[in-house]
Structure formats: C-alpha cells, structure tokens
Amino acid sequence: MKNLAYYVGQEKKDSDDVIGDQYDGVMLMQDMQINIKDIATKNVLVSINAPKATMDFGYMKYPVFCMFRYDERNKLSETTEDGQELFGFSPEQVRYMPEFGDSVLVIKDADEFIRRVATALQKEGLIHARGNVRYFDGNDLEYFQDVKDEPVHTAFWKRKKYSYQQEFRILIDKPIEDHYILNMVLKL
C-alpha cells in the first residue's frame, strides 16, 4: 500500500489527474475569503480572497489501499423480461481503466476479505478506517460537516470528477514514508 502523498504526487508531478488527485487527503475549500483578525479586538486586519485553500489534518503519510467497487452504479438498465440485471462499465471507466495497470484483482467475497484485512491489522496492533469514497462538487456542506466531525474522512472524499473510480478504501493509522506491506492469509 502506498501512502496518500503518493497519489497526490501523481497529479502534481506528472499532471496525471486520472489516478492522482492533488487534493486527496486534505479539506479543499474553493472561492474563500480568509479574514485574519486581531485576537483582542476581533477586528479584521487582513482579508484575502483565495480561489482554493486547503486544510491538512496530517493523513498524507497514511497508507491506503484503493479499490474499484463494481456495484449497483454499474447497472445498465432495468431488469430484463427474463429477470436478469445487466451490468457494465461506463464509457468514462472504459476510457480510463488502462491507466490503472494491466492486471485486476477480483474479490468475490468482500466481507471475508475485509475480515481478513482487519484480523491481520489487529495482529500487527494497527487501527484502520474503511469505506466508500464519496464525491463532492465545489463547497459542499455535507463534505465540510463530515470532515469537521471526523477529520480522517478527508481520505474518503474526492472531487466529483473522480466519481467514475467508485472507490472503496482501507486507510491504516500508521504514517509511512513510501509503502506498507500487510501480511495476511489468502485462499486461492
């Protein structure tokens, strides 16, 4: 697992905005007015217009395992006459999929996979957070409230332009410089 800083670096370094998001793991605020006030008088000393401002809560060095989640969002149509449901990839997913590599890992029993990850992390004395990534557009109040209540959720929000990724993430509470390898039991 790479840390969040790795993915941020993908867009900053290579202008790769397919995989990397330069605002991943931080709270992004757009078109903000920042006021600097005198502590004693509460008078505004300086007012600055900021097209973009970020707050970093310290999760950039945390390792994250990112997965595409194939789910009801991939449903192509209503149930067919014979009771089958048709699923497929969106044109955007088809266009960007090759950017993520030439291999795919299919997890058939997601609950069992998560249980094994949690067990392996517990054996190593590590805490983790997991969940679907949510996507926001502009100054989204739900996004701000969620991150205010749980700052670690900055790792579980991305800009709406990345919604085709349909990500599920596991974030480990252990700052690292580059990558982390979790030893766990898998049945093949």
Task: Give residue ranges: language-model regions.
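NAD-dependent ADP-ribosyltransferases
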Residues: M1-L188
